Amino acid sequence: MQFIDQARITVKAGRGGDGIVAFRREKYVPAGGPSGGDGGNGGNVVFQADSNLQTLLDFKFKQIILAENGRRGGPNKCTGASGNNIVLKVPCGTEVRHLETGIIFGDLTIDGESLVVAFGGIGGLGNAHYLSNRNRAPEKFTEGKDGEEWLLHLELKLLAEVGIIGLPNAGKSTLISVLSSARPKIADYPFTTLIPNLGVVRKPSGDGTVFADIPGLIEGAAEGIGLGHEFLRHIERTRLLIHLVDASALNPLEDIEIVENELSAYGHSLIDRPRILVLNKKELLDAKNLKKLERKLNQGSISEVISISAIMSNGLDILLNKIWSKLEI
């Protein structure tokens, strides 16, 4: 399935039905006169969060969405039927905002949560409303009002407590695959991950915690270079970041600095988010060089480093214990 996490659509609520002009003229109806009914109200446009959806793909080719119009009034003071609401299902984590002003209509994060974004127009009045002592046979009625119309921007921000970040080929997809049941595409070349991957990792209590692995960052990602900037929004909601570093890289310290700079440049308080620095692929270094690298990192601003081998499932218990303790703070 194609992963679409942004969409631009126009929504228009239904127009209210018109009131009508009608009269009761039956000889057996002593209180005859104007009997035109009111028009029905137009239908609303409603968004609803659905935990079974993972993408905004449905809106890629459906860019104008209309709710049903109200029906015109009927004789005998009958009100026309209101238009049906149109309910648009979106993934949990979808933010709905007005495209031109940026005003946020709502943020749908809970399964089943609903949000009315465009209200239908009010139905018009029939001539029965205009009966008076001066006018016993009014011909006046009103038309229904137009429904609200908005140009909207939909943005999906995945709901994950833990985000795994790092440069391409740091081993993020391997890590999430061994920690959870997620099965992302894994290969030994950069940019294997082209979309975010989600995996559920079980705590000792049995509760599940959602982890997100986003495509690798590169220098300049926050300014739009590479793939990672497209998906940094998906770690905005996380409580904890795992900064994964390839311990066997030519310059791991420089790699760390690149990612830290991108977090700072992106904003949204990502640089202040609690995180754990994890050296991966420790199986590719001898013990002496690994210790040397750990000491060098500990001498800087990084107080604690965890070394693992994701592919060999080594050191994962220590990492998970640290994650659970951080999330409980």
Curated annotation (Swiss-Prot):
It is an enzyme of class 3 (hydrolase). Its EC number is 3.6.5.-. Residues 1-159 form the Obg domain. Mg(2+) binds at residues 173, 193. GO terms for molecular function: ATP binding; GTP binding; GTPase activity; magnesium ion binding. Keywords: ATP-binding, Cytoplasm, GTP-binding, Hydrolase, Magnesium, Metal-binding, Nucleotide-binding. Monomer. It is found in: Cytoplasm. PROSITE patterns: G_OBG, GTP1_OBG, OBG. InterPro entries: G_OBG, GTP-bd, GTP-bd_Obg/CgtA, GTP1-OBG_CS, GTP1_OBG_dom, GTP1_OBG_dom_sf, OBG_GTPase, P-loop_NTPase. ATP binds at residues 166-173, 191-195, 213-216, 280-283, 309-311. Transmembrane segments: none annotated. One of its GO terms (cellular component) is cytoplasm. This is GTPase Obg. The keyword Cytoplasm applies. Belongs to the TRAFAC class OBG-HflX-like GTPase superfamily. OBG GTPase family. SUPFAM superfamilies: Obg GTP-binding protein N-terminal domain, P-loop containing nucleoside triphosphate hydrolases. GO terms for biological process: ribosome biogenesis. It comes from Prochlorococcus marinus (strain SARG / CCMP1375 / SS120). An essential GTPase which binds GTP, GDP and possibly (p)ppGpp with moderate affinity, with high nucleotide exchange rates and a fairly low GTP hydrolysis rate. Plays a role in control of the cell cycle, stress response, ribosome biogenesis and in those bacteria that undergo differentiation, in morphogenesis control. The keyword Nucleotide-binding applies. Its cofactor is Mg(2+). It comes from the Bacteria.
